[in-house]
């Protein structure tokens, strides 16, 4: 599984090459990189060293001023992709930043990047209360963060808020 996932890895440390079937673009994408991280975690091949050495340099490099990582970047190549990827907004996203933070917490990592990212995630949970869920995969990714964050009282309140919201 490890080698199958890493076949999608690019020299910049991100993952691309159509890892998600809606685009065949070889370019690294934040979402694909999160998918790779989640897959390695799920099958038991993820370690602190892999997170810090192979994943975090890419994520730190694409972090926005707000402290989060984008969901996707518009493909720069002419490879086939669904229309929604051609018009994607390249701003920080809860659905990519929250699971990354959750995995960092799960593996008991504490790196400087996490502070601003955590502020971004909590502010997004506040902001989304009047929005709609546009992706059925978003909520489970948010729960990764809420399950592992050290801020238990705040996480429990947010989970209850999400239950009411959904």
Language-model segment annotations:
Residues 1-166:
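Preference for long, amphipathic alpha-helical scaffolds in soluble/luminal domains
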